Amino acid sequence: MDPRVIALVPVVMDLLNFEPNIKHHFRAYGGWSFALEPYWKLNLTYYFDHPKFTELSGIIDPYTYRDKLIMPKLVVNCGNDEFFNNDNSRYWWHDMPYAYEMNKFVMLPNADHIVAGNSVLV
């Protein structure tokens, strides 16, 4: 991890621990959200259970590197996000280093994925 990174502030993308999280998305909606249409039209969702996708997740999923993510985190999510379920954090939050000591989680009520017109006061 680059020592210049002193904190993380991910906004609306809390899809860490991708594989169980994306399966939860499908089960919760009974299919894919309309927002994922470009991905399922290209049949990319078919590969979510493929061993090569598991291999890719091991590289691109920040959850894989959670032991190195020891800096404070402010996670900002939207309660009305079209892409991601608002309970995704249950698949990763408790596994983050210092989850309850140094990290904060904010849910913007009624905000969609674009977050336009919303602000966070911390």
Predicted features, each with a name:
Residues L69, V75-N77, D81:
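Short beta-strand/loop motif that positions the catalytic acidic residue
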